[in-house]
Amino acid sequence: EVEKRLNAKEFKENRSTVLIATKAFGMGIDKPNIRWTLHMGIPSSIEAFYQEAGRAGRDKNLAICNVIFSEVDAEQTDNALSGDGNLVDLRHAAQKMRSNDDDVSRALFFHLNAFSGTEEECSSASDVLKIIGDLNERKKVKFTFDNNNSKSDLERSLIRLKKCGIIEDLEVNYSSKNIFVRIRPFDFEFSRKTIENYIRESQPARLKNIMSKLDDIKTTDESRQPQHLCNLMIDFTYDVVERSRRRMLYEAILLGRNYSNDNEIRQYLLNYLQEGLGAEKIAQLA
């Protein structure tokens, strides 16, 4: 960690000319005179690529961006990502592509790690709620994780509960491998409002449907309402977020596959981003 910070400091102070970094670390580099970026692998979306490439040329002088992209079997990629299949179908397709060992198979591996499935997530959320116990009092609960996978699953469940207004805040301590969670007393109307606000900001066209489902949950046994609310948010995440990220990944793959000329890529990016802005406004009006 100390070495990483030192390398970044030397790069930003022009005492080093090259920096190799992960996407997350590289996005934190604010330096106006970067002349060249080299992207290994597929960006998660065209928007992400636009932001990552934007690390270079901030002083308005010429900067060059290159992407190294590998795809063994375009037909397999299209079969996996071009349709609107469910997550089980995608998992089977990704399994067949593992031996390709290309950027597409690696991108699918990370995507599927981020989305384990609705049944798995609902079960994990149920386990977390059991550990939290009584939701009628304000309290602080400590969770411990063993490895990166268990941390990811646990943190994902806690974030879902936070979006439901059940968890007030959470803090991760990596050195002790603990997550400290502040719980607010459960209030259905507060959770309802929290979810409505989240949907209104992210997917306003779906708000009416979500509100109808919230009305149904309100009629259920109060002790089961937190789980029902979390299940609702998990279903929404997979129906909207997972499918959206899958589609964005495919669009990034098509960009890498079909365009190599500077002007073509630049025009494609501009058209794509402008279309996205227009689509967002239409969705808000729907």
Model region roles, listed by residue range:
Residues 1-25, 29-286:
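C-terminal helicase lobe
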